[in-house]
C-alpha cells in the first residue's frame, strides 16, 4: 500500500500533535475493513458502476447489486490516488494544497436548510434561500481563517422550481474568489457544473481540468451502500477532472456498530469503495478521504455533532487517511446548540481541536448550529476567531537559544518588566490576537456599550456585507455562465 510520504499515525505538522493509534491498530482497522469489503461487500445501485467493478475483477451479484472488492484492488487504488492536489481559487492567492500529512485547513459547514439570523437582539430561524448562499460566500471571502468555500445551505427558494443544485454552483463561484466545494451535487447535472467551470475559463476545458475552481462531495449510504447519485458523482467527477470527496455519515449505534472502532471499519469500507470506483474510472483521479461520521444518541434519537465522539472519530479518520496517503476532509468546529451561546463555544472548540491536532487536511463546520441543520453568519465570524486561536495553540512552544531568552532575562534582571525591550516591541503580534473575542477589563467593556459577542459579531457581519468587495467575474463570461444555469432551469421545467 502506497504511503505517499505519509507515515502511519503521524502528521507532518510542526507543533502539538495528537496520535490516536499505533501502527498495529491502524493495520487492524485496515484488515477488518478488507474482510468487510469481501463479506458482505458493498451494495452498488448504479449499473454503470457495477460494470466498472466487474470489468476490473470484482465479484458482482446482479440480483442483489452487491459488489465484493478484493484487497488487491484497494491497494492498487491507494497507489493511484494522488496524495497531493491543489484546489484553485478564482484568485490564485487562495489556492489551497490538500496533502496527506500536510497543513490543516478550514472551510464552512454544509449543507443546512435553515438560517439563524440575529434581529434586534434576538435570533430568528428561517428557511435558507439563494441570497443567503451569496451572502455567506462573500463573508467567507473576507474571513482570514476559512480557506475555501463549501456549500453552507440549500437554495430552498428554487426547490421544485428550477435546477436548484445548478444555482448552488454559480452563486458561490460568483460571490467568492476562493475555491468552491459543492456538498450537495446531483449526479445527472454534473455536466452543467463542468460547463459552468469551462465557461469561466473561456471554454478551455483543459485549463478547467488543470486549475479546478470547483469540487464535489458525495456520501455513501450507511451501512455499506453506494447510491446511483453517489456513483455518478464519483464517475463523472473523475472523468471531468474534478476533485471528489467520498464522505461517510455513519452513526455509531444506528447505521454502524456502537463501538467506535467498529464504526471506523464500516466507515472505512464505504469510503474506500468510493475511492476504488474513482480510480477504476480514471487512474489518478483526485479524491479526499471524508468523514461526517458521529454517534447516534440512543436516548435523544439524534446524531450529535458537538460531541467528543465526533471529535475523536474525525481525528481517527485523519489518521486513517494519513495511513493511506490520502488528503482528509472531516467534520469539526461543529455544534448541537441552536444559537450562538455558551454551549456553542464549548462544542466548537472541542470538535475543532481534536481533528486539528490529528492533522486533518480540511475541517468543515464553521458557521454550523443545530446538529448541522442551521447556519449562522454571526457564528461564522465567531468561529473565524476560534479557528485562529486553535491555530495558535497548534504551534506549540518553540525551544531554541533565541526563545529561551537568557540574555533578555539577564538584561532586565530582578523585579523589572520586559515591556521596554526592543524584542518585545518587535514581537507585538506574537501573542494570540482574536478579532471579536473581548479581552478588556469590565470597565472598558461597559464604557463601550456592554455588547455581548453576538451583537459584536452581527455588527461585523453587517459591515462586511456592506463594504467587502469580491473580485468580479468578467461580465461577458458571467453571462455565459448564467446561460448554462438558465439552460438547466429550462430542462428541469420540461422534464
From Swiss-Prot:
Enzyme Commission number: 2.1.1.250
GO biological process: methanogenesis; methylation
Keyword annotations from UniProtKB, A to Z: Methanogenesis, Methyltransferase, Pyrrolysine, Transferase
Enzyme class, UniProt record, top EC level: transferase
GO function terms (MF aspect): trimethylamine methyltransferase activity
Entry keyword Transferase: yes
Pathway participation: One-carbon metabolism; methanogenesis from trimethylamine
Pfam families with a match to the protein in the record: MTTB
InterPro entries to which the protein is assigned, alphabetical: MttB-like_sf, MttB_Methanosar, MTTB_MeTrfase
Record field: catalytic activity: Co(I)-[trimethylamine-specific corrinoid protein] + trimethylamine + H(+) = methyl-Co(III)-[trimethylamine-specific corrinoid protein] + dimethylamine
NCBIfam families associated with the record: trimeth_pyl
Function: Catalyzes the transfer of a methyl group from trimethylamine to the corrinoid cofactor of MttC.
Subunit structure: Can form a complex with MttC.
Entry's family note: Belongs to the trimethylamine methyltransferase family.
Protein name: Trimethylamine methyltransferase MttB2
Record organism: Methanosarcina acetivorans (strain ATCC 35395 / DSM 2834 / JCM 12185 / C2A)
Lineage, highest ranks first: Archaea, Methanobacteriati, Methanobacteriota, Stenosarchaea group, Methanomicrobia
